[in-house]
Amino acid sequence: MPVRKKPRNDQNGRDPWHHERALYGAGYARVAGVDEAGRGPLAGPVVAAAVILPPYRRFSAIRDSKLVPAAERETLYRQIRKHALAIGIAACPARVIDRVNILEATRLAMARAVARLKPPPDAVLVDGWRLPALQVDQWPIVDGDRDSVSIAAASLVAKVIRDAIMRRLERLYPGYGFANHKGYGTREHLACIARLGVTPAHRCSFEPVRQALQGKLDLAPEVSGEEN
């Protein structure tokens, strides 16, 4: 019988596999992590990813996408794509966000991402909250992208995919700087909205965009920032 090495802890002393380890020990066969990217921006979709990593394989560099520089995210994304047992991706565009609200759009994208996993999981670790649409055992974890390697992997995939979408939107709507600010409410972005107007990629239910449509956009505050 092979000897299993002691799990490697992260810089905070935690075993990044401890949630997954508990579920595999309880008899689950395929444990997925699911997370999203893009809840806060004024433009672009909210993107969700679900990932099933091979049990107990070391992924020491995988961590919350917000803590990873852009160049390293791409490297880790390729590593995840190469080794993951399954990856599911889904997105809800601005028009859906405006119709159902950002919380429900996020839940919808996350549930769809899980549904696209082949083979399907029998347990899901969810960043933040329960997903009512899931027909599988699930465990919501607050700050899960910092506490579960599977959720962290999902956060990286979602972030890389969303950034690629924002680069495509930059080509579709030149001059807005989508490739730079990723749709977040930076002063640069607000100035572009004031100068060029609102595009179909913008979330009209978000207050700064609604203000722009009413001709009342305040350029002073920076609504939200995000890592590059």
Predicted segments with their positions:
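RNase H-like, Mg2+-dependent phosphodiesterase core
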Residues: 1-228
